[in-house]
Regions:
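Phosphate-interacting basic helix/loop segments used at nucleotide- and nucleic-acid interfaces
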Residues: 1-17
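A generic short-segment signal for beta-strand/edge and adjacent turn/coil regions
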Residues: 1-5, 23-28, 52-58
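Charged, alpha-helix-enriched surfaces in structured cytosolic catalytic cores
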Residues: 4, 40-43
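A short linear-motif detector with a strong N-terminal bias
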Residues: 12-15, 34-38, 63-68, 88
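N-terminal glycine-rich anion-binding loops that anchor highly charged ligand groups
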Residues: 16-37
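A very general structural signal that marks isolated residues within well-ordered alpha-helical segments
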Residues: 27, 104-105
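Glycine-rich, N-terminal phosphate-binding loop and its surrounding beta-alpha-beta segment
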Residues: 43-97
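Conserved small/polar residues in nucleotide/adenosyl-binding loops
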Residues: 98-103
């Protein structure tokens, strides 16, 4: 499998393209679909939801999660890498990303 350079990946993001970021085989051994929110639209979200088949995540600072009262997904995080997630949210008034269905409400 061929991988592009970090520089090419950054350029693709700057151009509004989505990329796949893969981690090490000894970690989670998975790929994440990544896009810049300013370039995202309904098609991007639908592609991530249907083809990615996982959570659609938006990185936020801990202070933002606290201000929005977003609880931790797990009270006792035992992940060896300390990966942290808040509880899932799916509401157009509180979510950074939304589908056209939510936008219509």
């Amino acid at each position: 499998m061929q991988f592009d350079t970090i520089e090419l990946a950054i350029e693709a993001l700057r151009n509004g393209d989505s990329i796949i970021v893969v981690d090490d085989e000894d970690r989670e051994n998975e790929g994440d679909l990544v896009a810049v929110t300013e370039w995202m639209d309904d098609n991007t979200i639908n592609f991530m939801a249907k083809e990615g088949r996982g959570l659609i995540c938006a990185p936020i600072d801990k202070s933002i999660a606290e201000r929005l009262k977003l609880q931790s997904m797990e009270q006792n995080n035992t992940d060896i890498y300390g990966t942290h997630f808040t509880v899932s949210i799916d509401h157009y008034k509180t979510c950074l990303l939304y589908t056209s269905d939510a936008a219509d409400e």
